[in-house]
Amino acid sequence: VVYESSPYFAGTGSDSAQYFWNVRQELDADPSERAKMPPIQRRGKRPVISNSQTRAWVPYGFIVVHSSAPGTGLSQGCPTVGTRIEALAPKAVIDWLNGRAKGFTTPDGNEEVKAFWSTGRVGMIGTSYNGTIPFAAATTGVKGLEAIIPVSPNNSYYHYYRSNGLVRSPGGYLGEDVDVLYDFIHSNPDNCEYCDSVYKRSVMQARHDRRSGDYNEFWAERDLMNYVDDFRAATLMAHRFNDWNVMISQ
């Protein structure tokens, strides 16, 4: 089984600079308010949420499986951008593909769906955010995840959004931060108001610290290098040296 998980399958928000942070801010000063990004018009319906990877792998006899990351598309929960939730969600899918977890046709239904067609041997693949998720899944040590191919993955959100105690912006996205990425991927309109209140404002904007840019518990939770003790999947990783968005040091 070739498995790709993504926060992008159901659509994305605006990349207009008017919804990013104002970078003209002095160190140790409170940032100015950021304009709210318009809601995302969710696209995609079950059972087909993406055709990614199908042409590359299905002709060779592989089954391709897709899932939307937590808080995106038809997935439940809130987008947490880099926490253990994004590792445990694909782990649950792999557990289902191996018959260790139950799946149902609806979140609150009782009609079970079994992956009778799965051998239980899973490989994950993806680029950028879609490449970070396989790495995160592999840190759980889940049985059945045999190999991953992450292309330009981001394994540390601190190094993506901060640099040696300073706030930085990924290449090409001046003023972006972890809460901006949250808005960009939050394509589940059913949970937007709730998640904005209990997670974006109460956790992300309260703790990501645009005043100093220092490393703290918020960023430590989003550093995959802190969770590699159980990593067991064979890995083929690719990265460009001149990538100024997700840099090789991340």
Predicted features, each with a name:
Residues V2-P7, H66, W96:
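Structural cue for short, hydrophobic secondary-structure segments
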Residues P7-R43, P47-R55, P59, A87, ...:
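Accessory cap/linker subdomain of secreted extracellular hydrolases
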Residues G44-P47, G73-A92, A101:
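Catalytic nucleophile-loop/oxyanion-hole region of alpha/beta-hydrolase
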Residues T54, V58-L74:
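Conserved alpha/beta-hydrolase
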Residues N155, N242-D243:
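Short, glycine-/Ser/Thr-/acidic-enriched flexible segments
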Residues F231, M237-H239:
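Short beta-strand/loop motif that positions the catalytic acidic residue
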Residues W244-S249:
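Conserved alpha/beta-hydrolase "acid-adjacent" motif
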